[in-house]
C-alpha cells in the first residue's frame, strides 16, 4: 500500500485559496470592465452617472442588510450559518420594500433616479442570497468553489448589459444585467454549498451575533460611505454626466487593486493569530503583492492618462482625463489602509478600525464639499489625498509590529521609488499624449515588475513552500 497523502499545510491551503481568489477577481473584473468599455461607446455619460448613483444606494443598503454578520461568520466558532441566512433574507426583503417606497427622496440628485431605484432595489434581496455560501467557502479557505459561479455571473452581466445597451436600453441595460447576475450567482453558489453548510436555525443566537458583529457592521457602513460618497457630493454640485466621468475614471484607477487584492488575507490572518512571525509575514507579503502591482498601474496612468481614457472609454470621454490624473495614486494610499483594516479585524480591534474610517469619512466629506464647490469633480478627487485616518492606520501598524515595521517601511519605499526611474525615462524620451510614450511605459512597467519579482521571489517561495 502506498503512503497516505499528506494533508495540505495551512500555507498551501492559503496559496490555493489565494490563487482561486485571483482567478475569480481577474476573470470577473476583466470581463466586467470590458463590458463597461463597450458600453461607454453605447450609453451616454448621463446614463453611466444615473446608474452609478443608483448602484451606490443599493450597495450601501446591502451593508445595512448584512449587519456585519458575514464578516463575523469567518471568526465565529459556532458557525451559525442558518441564523445568518434567516437574518439576511428577512432584512433584504424589508430593505427592498423600503427603497421602493422611499425612492422619491433621492429625486434631488436626478429626476430619473427614483424610477430606476424602485427596480434596482430588488438587487438588495437577490445579492443577499449568496452571502452565506460565500462566507462559508471563504472561512474554509476553499474559495475555489466560487470560481464557476463568479465567472458565470461576470459573463452574464457583461453579455446582457452590452446586448441591451446595443438595443438602446440605456441605463436599464446595467440594471437588468446586475439583477440577472445576482440571481444566477446566488443559485449557483448554493448548488455548490448545499449539504455542506450547517443550516441549523438558532434565533436565540441572533442578538449575541448582532452584538459581536456591531463594530464590523459600522466599519462596513463607514467604509461603504468612504468609498462611494464622492459620487453623491459631485451629484450635488455637478450634472449627472460629470458623475459618469468621475465614476469611470475611478474605475480605471482602481482596476488593478480590485483584481490583485488578496481575498484570502482576512481568514489567513485569523489562522495565524497565535503565530506572530507568520502573522507579520503574511501581512507584509500581501502588502508587497498588492501595492507592488498598484504602484506600476499608478505611474502608468499618471504618464498616459489621455491614451488610457481614449482606449478604454473612447474620444467622447475626454473630460475624464484630468480626473484620472488626480486619482491615479489614490489606490496606493487607500489600499494600505484597507489591508491594515483586515489585520485589525483579525485581531478583533474593531473599534480602532472604526475610528480610523470615521476620521477618513469626516475628512472626505469636509474637504470634498469645500474642494468640489471650488474646483468641481477634480476637487473631489483631490480630497481623497487628505484622509487623516490613513496616518492613524500607519501609526497603528507601526505600534503592532514595532521593530519589524522598519522592514515593512523599507518595502513600501522600494515599491514606490524603484519604478520611478523607468517611467521617468519613458516620459523624458517621448512627448506627452503620444503612442511612443504609451509603448515605452509598457516596457517600463515590465522592467520594473521584473526587478520587483526578483527582489521578492525568495520570501514568497519560503512562505508558501512550507509543508505540513
Segments the model singles out, each with a brief description of its role:
Residues 115-121, 147-195, 211-212, 219, ...:
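Hydrophobic alpha-helical transmembrane segments
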Amino acid at each position: 500500500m502506498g503512503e497516505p497523502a499528506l494533508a495540505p499545510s495551512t500555507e498551501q491551503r492559503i496559496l490555493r485559496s489565494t490563487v482561486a481568489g485571483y482567478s475569480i477577481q481577474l476573470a470577473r473584473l476583466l470581463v466586467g470592465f470590458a463590458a463597461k468599455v463597450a458600453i461607454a461607446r453605447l450609453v451616454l455619460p448621463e446614463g453611466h452617472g444615473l446608474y452609478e448613483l443608483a448602484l451606490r444606494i443599493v450597495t450601501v443598503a446591502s451593508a445595512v442588510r448584512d449587519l456585519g454578520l458575514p464578516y463575523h461568520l469567518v471568526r465565529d466558532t459556532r458557525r451559525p450559518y442558518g441564523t445568518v441566512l434567516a437574518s439576511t433574507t428577512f432584512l433584504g426583503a424589508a430593505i427592498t420594500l423600503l427603497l421602493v417606497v422611499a425612492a422619491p427622496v433621492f429625486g434631488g440628485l436626478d429626476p430619473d433616479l427614483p424610477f430606476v431605484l424602485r427596480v434596482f432595489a430588488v438587487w438588495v434581496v437577490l445579492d443577499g442570497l449568496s452571502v452565506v455560501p460565500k462566507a462559508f467557502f471563504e472561512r474554509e479557505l476553499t474559495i475555489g468553489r466560487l470560481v464557476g459561479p463568479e465567472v458565470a455571473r461576470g459573463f452574464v452581466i457583461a453579455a446582457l448589459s452590452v446586448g441591451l445597451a446595443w438595443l438602446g436600453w440605456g441605463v436599464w441595460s446595467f440594471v437588468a444585467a446586475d439583477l440577472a447576475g445576482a440571481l444566477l450567482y446566488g443559485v449557483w453558489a448554493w448548488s455548490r454549498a448545499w449539504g455542506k453548510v450547517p443550516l441549523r436555525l438558532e434565533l436565540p443566537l441572533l442578538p449575541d451575533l448582532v452584538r459581536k458583529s456591531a463594530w464590523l457592521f459600522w466599519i462596513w457602513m463607514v467604509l461603504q460611505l468612504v468609498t462611494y460618497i464622492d459620487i453623491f457630493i459631485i451629484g450635488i454640485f455637478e450634472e449627472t454626466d460629470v458623475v459618469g466621468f468621475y465614476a469611470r475614471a475611478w474605475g480605471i484607477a482602481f482596476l488593478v487593486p480590485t483584481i490583485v487584492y488578496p481575498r484570502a488575507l482576512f481568514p489567513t490572518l485569523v489562522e495565524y493569530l497565535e503565530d506572530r512571525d507568520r502573522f507579520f509575514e503574511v501581512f507584509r507579503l500581501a502588502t508587497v503583492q498588492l501595492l507592488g502591482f498598484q504602484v506600476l498601474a499608478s505611474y502608468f496612468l499618471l504618464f498616459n492618462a489621455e491614451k488610457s481614457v481614449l482606449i478604454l472609454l473612447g474620444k467622447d470621454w475626454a473630460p475624464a482625463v484630468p480626473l484620472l490624473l488626480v486619482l491615479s495614486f489614490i489606490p496606493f494610499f487607500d489600499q494600505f489602509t484597507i489591508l491594515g483594516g483586515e489585520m485589525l479585524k483579525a485581531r478583533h480591534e474593531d473599534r480602532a478600525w472604526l475610528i480610523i474610517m470615521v476620521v477618513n469619512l469626516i475628512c472626505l466629506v469636509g474637504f470634498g464639499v469645500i474642494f468640489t464647490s471650488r474646483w468641481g469633480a477634480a476637487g473631489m478627487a483631490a480630497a481623497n489625498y487628505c484622509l487623516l485616518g490613513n496616518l492613524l492606520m500607519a501609526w497603528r501598524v507601526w505600534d503592532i509590529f514595532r521593530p519589524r515595521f522598519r522592514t515593512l517601511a523599507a518595502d513600501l519605499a522600494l515599491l514606490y521609488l524603484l519604478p520611478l526611474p523607468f517611467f521617468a525615462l519613458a516620459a523624458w524620451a517621448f512627448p506627452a499624449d503620444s503612442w511612443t510614450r504609451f509603448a515605452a511605459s509598457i516596457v517600463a512597467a515590465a522592467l520594473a515588475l521584473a526587478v520587483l519579482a526578483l527582489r521578492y521571489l525568495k520570501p514568497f517561495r519560503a512562505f508558501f513552500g512550507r509543508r505540513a
